[in-house]
Amino acid sequence: MKQIWQALKAHQQAVEHRAILDLFTDPRRAETFSTRLGDMLFDWSKTNIDHTARDLLIDLAGAAGVAEKREAMFSGAKINETEGRAVLHTALRNMDRPVRVDGVDVTPALRETHARMQAFVRDLRSGRFTGQGGPITDVVNIGIGGSDLGPAMACLALAPYADGPRCHFVSNVDGAHIHDTLQDLDPATTLVIVASKTFTTIETMTNAETAKRWMAKRVSDPAAQFAAVSTAADKTAAFGIDASRVFGFEDWVGGRYSMWGPIGLALMIAIGPEAFDAFLAGGAEMDRHFREAPFAENLPVLLALVGLWHNQICGHATRAVLPYDQRLARLPAYLQQLEMESNGKRVAMDGHELTHHSGPIVWGEPGTNGQHAFYQLIHQGSRIVPCEFLVAREGHEPDLAHQHLLLVSNCLAQSEALLRGRSVEEARAILGKKGLTGSELERQARHRVFPGNRPSTVLAYEKLTPATLGRIVALYEHRVFVEGVILGINSYDQWGVELGKELALALQPMLEGRAGTEGKDGSTAQLVAYLRR
């Protein structure tokens, strides 16, 4: 692998100043550097990756053992080595084939849980399960991290398919979040879902207790309108939640990969079991593609390799995710957790510090909003930010087709502008037509130059349906896997979240005035003194 890394770096240095636009002298450039799956098109031709770089990147994936580790993951091997666990979120969307963990086929239990979820959701949506004031009108999902970001993103994305109760999401321990969410709801017609595998997550359980007190003001048996997604049956029982409304999942399903199962309960309630199954089917389709397609035609592999080229080879530290699809507004935040919690590591699988950067900083906002905010830096800033556009050919509002046309034209224009830029000569010509001359023209022209030659990709799809969203989410999950394998890291633990939790527990009595700040650094002690109640 070392030789391939070196060859990639040498090639990048040789072509660093080449204009990406020049690559399009090849009339087949766009076709060659694009990949299709069903109605999805991934166009990565507006990057500086040429045939040589592509072939080296594919060789890198082969040398890293992506194919072998891929099969190990799907077969239930314990590839999460630091926690001694399998990584089988894929089984949640492929329940029709045996998957063995420690020699036991886990799919019968998955099918049973899925059937229980469907039965509960059908009862709730039909009015057979009611609140103490009538049919359930609102559902509040209380969770954090993977118990919140995925289902919240998906509920917004699939809003056109939401024909069930309204779904709300509470994650932050800041009391303002749950206060503002509950204040306009009726406790007697609200269901609260507490999503915590251990039923001990501080933020989640604090909010759950607050919700229970809120509900108790209006209903005689508040726990009767709670459901739980947890494996801690003793704790959910102590909370008062009947076992029929408790849905568990295994430790080989990581939080940020979990919305395919019980963590997706709120999503299933919102869109119904049939649409939820279509979401699962879309993910399963991407799984099959990932397992079967050769690397040169494999969407998750290619997304990963393009990302590695930009981050590890070119040194671009961030990637902007820019969905030109308002209902994907939460996708960048979801991908922040998926990618940065998975691949934001400093130690390789063997315990040694990495000799290269790990995953990139992922951020973004939906278009066209971002064009009037941070695109200035993307187009004319001194740092190059690779951009990842997502856009649908068709919207959900046929009476607003013209607005969708404007949206798509803006997406394509931004991608083209990043590629093409605007030269100083072109800027002079434009200003000259406006009547500027001499030194003022020259002064203004410099400010109107766009360097261009900034890489971007476009993921286009027919329409944002449940199946399409399933394909997109699974695509990014597998991208993370491929990048992690090539970087030699464990993408499925998250020890970086632990230290802050431990310190927060120690700080609570200090902030309450029950303990001193001995042993704390001067800054923390000062802040405790200022913020102490």
UniProtKB/Swiss-Prot annotation:
Catalytic activity: alpha-D-glucose 6-phosphate = beta-D-fructose 6-phosphate
GO molecular function, one term: monosaccharide binding
Chief subcellular location: cytoplasm
Coiled-coil ranges (or none): none
Cleaved signal peptide residues: none
Isomerase keyword on record: yes
One GO biological process term: glycolytic process
Native organism: Cereibacter sphaeroides (strain ATCC 17023 / DSM 158 / JCM 6121 / CCUG 31486 / LMG 2827 / NBRC 12203 / NCIMB 8253 / ATH 2.4.1.)
Pathway assigned in UniProt: Carbohydrate biosynthesis; gluconeogenesis; Carbohydrate degradation; glycolysis; D-glyceraldehyde 3-phosphate and glycerone phosphate from D-glucose: step 2/4
Record-stated family: Belongs to the GPI family.
GO terms for cellular component: cytosol
Alphabetized UniProt keyword annotations: Cytoplasm, Gluconeogenesis, Glycolysis, Isomerase
EC number(s) stated in the UniProt entry for this protein: 5.3.1.9
Function: Catalyzes the reversible isomerization of glucose-6-phosphate to fructose-6-phosphate.
This protein's name: Glucose-6-phosphate isomerase
Domain of life: Bacteria
InterPro entries: G6P_Isomerase (IPR001672), G6P_Isomerase_C (IPR023096), Phosphoglucose_isomerase_CS (IPR018189), SIS_dom_sf (IPR046348), SIS_PGI_1 (IPR035476), SIS_PGI_2 (IPR035482)
SUPFAM superfamilies, sorted: SIS domain
Active site, per annotation: E341 (proton donor), H372, K501
Localization terms from the record: Cytoplasm
